[in-house]
A protein has these predicted regions:
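Active-site loop/helix belt of alpha/beta enzymes
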Residues: 1-100, 189
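Charged (often Lys/Glu-rich) extended helix/loop segments that serve as interaction or gating elements
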Residues: 66, 75-219
Length: 219
């Protein structure tokens, strides 16, 4: 048995280059101890993106220089898997406000998109900003929370203490859903999969039609 490759995975949504630099040092130690010449070194992914305003954007310039040095020193091919970093901020989920419900200390904006369409907020308590499609200068009275229609306590998206005035039938967009959006979606609660539209410059094309109930039940 001959080992030709080594693969590492150190985490996800990493916003500092330091863990990646440490990984290279660990790999060097492994190569020195085992004296194995790996033809392929898969450094994985994990490169984070800025979901929140205060998220630090990762700087990979110094890391890339170390990778180039590592590649030359050990004469190997380098593989990366930067999925989120490529597609994370390339997509939005456009959804409609179905109802407004007044709570004791906040207003609920119930959307027609739920955790079945976008799971990250329910699964990881992830933060995804919601942007009004049409902006106005009016302010909502008190806190506003965007939630979904699924009968689960985790079917919620984000709460704002200050937000513009929202009305029933308004459209809003959930941001940065390109990674782990469609791939984590499901038919939970007998909900059809939503349509997907790709926009290239001024042209839009449907790449997945909205699923109908008949095809859902015939699965």
């Amino acid at each position: 048995l001959k080992l030709d490759a080594v693969s590492v995975h150190i985490g996800s949504q990493i916003l500092s280059e330091n863990p990646f630099k440490k990984t290279l040092k660990v790999l060097e130690e492994i190569i020195k101890k085992t004296k194995i010449h790996f033809k392929f070194v898969d450094l994985g992914g994990g490169f984070g993106i800025a979901y929140k305003k205060n998220d630090k954007k990762i700087n990979l310039k110094s890391y890339s220089k170390l990778v180039e040095k590592f590649k030359k020193k050990y004469n190997c091919s380098i593989i990366f898997e930067p999925g989120r970093a490529i597609v994370g901020n390339t997509a939005i989920l456009v959804t409609k406000v179905q109802y407004l419900k007044k709570g004791s200390n906040k207003t609920f904006a119930i959307l027609n998109a739920g955790m079945n369409d976008f799971m990250r907020t329910a699964l990881y308590d992830a933060v995804h900003n919601i942007i009004p499609v049409i902006k106005n200068s009016k302010k909502n009275r008190g806190p506003l929370e965007f939630v979904g229609p699924i009968c689960e306590t985790t079917c919620k998206f984000i709460k704002y203490n200050k937000y513009q005035k929202i009305n029933q039938s308004d459209f809003v967009a959930i941001s940065d859903v390109g990674a782990y959006g469609a791939s984590l979606s499901s038919n939970y609660n007998t909900k059809p999969l939503i349509a997907e539209i790709i926009i290239n410059k001024s042209k839009a094309r449907v790449i997945r039609k909205k699923q109908d109930i008949k095809s859902l039940l015939n699965q």
